[in-house]
A protein has these predicted regions:
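Conserved catalytic core of the tyrosine transesterase superfamily
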Residues: 1-319
């Protein structure tokens, strides 16, 4: 019978080559499985896969109980997925997760979103940096053009940072004004880019960088070394531009995604359409954006609450 390490290798290989999961997902799966393996070693449990039972899993759950609920859910889900795979492949006789109920309550935090004024401030600052350096030759000016294209596309499409970082040149159709992204579960979706300024930003970036993009292997957004612009680099440029635009709170690419969805909902766009744009498998995931901000709430209650239609004589209201 195999040990946990050997089973982890089999499972990760299955996830990569048969399920086609992203490198990011595989990375976190690997981290979670290694942590579980280390837990067994430190606590002198057998690493033989057949020796792992419900009691071992409960002890492991207790050992990670101080982590954030979302992190705990992911770690347990990773291990459960491995055991389900082993059961399906007939590598184990008993799956310890069978008839084992694990409930992890996760606080329902509202998404961190920007209002339209904050988005506009970031856009204006980013374009200003380009104008300030238009007379400067070299990479500095080109970098500003790239940064504008990145921020415009984040807000125009609501894509995930991983989807933007891995966007291929062949999937950017500037003639038909659309992009094709590969999201979670290797699922592809097409998103139209309809805003004139966003289109202009992409076209200007591509005209300047297209030869380097081809030399760099076909990834659309590249760095100064003609390599893929990493997720971390995108996060850094977004945070930097937001901070220099005068926004003190932490702004990330995912905040742009949240803001994209929330602001569309506030414009009464159908939630099912937003679900497709975001690449959510379930509409339950999209429904987190149905929260309403204070100003919108105030407007709705002022204009639409039925109390405004009540006619009560003044003498009844006299004190």
């Amino acid at each position: 019978m195999k040990n946990v390490q050997a089973c982890s290798i089999d499972f990760l290989s299955h996830c990569k080559y048969e399920k086609g999961l992203s490198d990011t997902t595989l990375k976190f799966y690997g981290i979670d499985l290694k942590q579980f393996s280390n837990f067994l070693k430190i606590n002198f449990y057998s690493s033989e896969i057949s020796d792992i039972d419900k009691n071992v899993l409960r002890e492991y759950l207790q050992s990670i109980s101080t982590s954030k609920p979302k992190t705990i859910k992911r770690k347990i889900a990773t291990i459960k997925a491995m055991f389900n795979f082993l059961e399906y492949e007939d590598q184990i006789l008993i799956n310890p997760f069978r008839k084992m109920r694990i409930q992890i309550r996760e606080p329902k935090n509202l998404p961190n979103v920007m209002n339209i004024t904050e988005v506009e401030k970031i856009m204006k600052y980013t374009y200003k940096t380009k104008d300030d350096e238009k007379r400067i030759t070299g990479y500095s000016y080109a970098e500003k053009i790239r940064n504008i294209a990145v921020i415009e596309l984040l807000f125009a499409t609501g894509v995930r940072v991983s989807e933007l970082s891995n966007l291929k040149e062949e999937f950017v159709d500037l003639n038909n004004l659309q992009i094709k992204v590969r999201g979670k579960g290797n699922k592809e979706r097409i998103i139209q880019v309809c805003n004139k300024e966003s289109i202009n930003a992409l076209q200007e970036y591509y005209m300047l960088f297209h030869s380097k993009i081809k030399a760099g292997g076909g990834v659309f957004f590249i760095n100064r070394f003609n390599k893929r612009l990493s997720e971390q680099s995108i996060r850094f440029l977004v945070r930097k531009n937001a901070r220099l635009a005068g926004i003190e709170r932490r702004i990330t690419p995912h905040v742009f995604r949240h803001s994209f969805a929330t602001l569309l909902l506030e414009e009464d766009v159908d939630i099912k359409y937003i679900q497709h744009l975001l690449g959510h498998s379930s509409i339950m995931t999209t429904q987190i954006y149905t929260h309403v901000n204070g100003e919108k709430q105030k407007k709705i209650l002022t204009q639409q609450h039925p109390r405004k239609n009540f006619l009560i004589k003044e003498e009844y209201l006299a004190i």
